[in-house]
Design a protein with these regions (language model features):
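Cyclophilin-like peptidyl-prolyl cis-trans isomerases
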Residues: 1-150
Length: 150
């Protein structure tokens, strides 16, 4: 297990334990993106109360959000894609976001702010918040409304 910290612009942090034994490809990719500073300056662009917060793909400048892009896709490490991954999508679990294509995850991730058992076996869960303070930060972010720029 390795540990990472997501540092927010308001000074709060989200501490996360990464589980290499559950999703080795996903953790390796996530750590590579961290080492490359890929996530620096990105925002949580999708927040849904009592569900999750999603980030890892967009930059916000106060007026609009822009997709960052440029990250390679990886194999989806979850049961419906033929990979054993029994990490339950409970509160605080971090998982890879993807399109309907099972091997389309790249940099976007989400952190569950509630129990999301319906996601089990469908998305590559690969870690969990390390402490109650981090989970409280996730839950508070999930209550922030986001806007559509369509």
């Amino acid at each position: 297990m390795s540990k990472i910290q997501i540092q927010l612009s308001d000074g709060r942090n989200i501490n996360i334990d990464l589980y290499e034994d559950v999703a080795p490809i996903t953790v390796k990719n996530f750590k590579k993106l961290i080492k490359e500073n890929f996530f620096d300056g990105l925002c949580f662009h999708r927040t849904i109360k009592d569900f999750m917060i999603q980030g890892g793909g967009f930059v916000a400048d106060g007026r609009a959000i822009k997709e960052k892009g440029g990250a390679d896709t990886i194999k989806g490490e979850f049961l419906s894609n033929g990979v054993k991954n029994d990490l339950h999508h409970g509160e605080g679990v971090i998982s890879m976001a993807r399109t309907n294509v099972k091997d389309s995850a790249s940099s976007q991730f989400f952190i569950c702010s509630a129990d999301c058992a319906f996601l089990d076996g469908q998305y590559a869960a690969f870690g969990k918040t390390s402490d109650e303070e981090s989970l409280a930060v996730v839950k508070s972010i999930s209550k922030v409304p986001t806007h559509s720029f369509s």
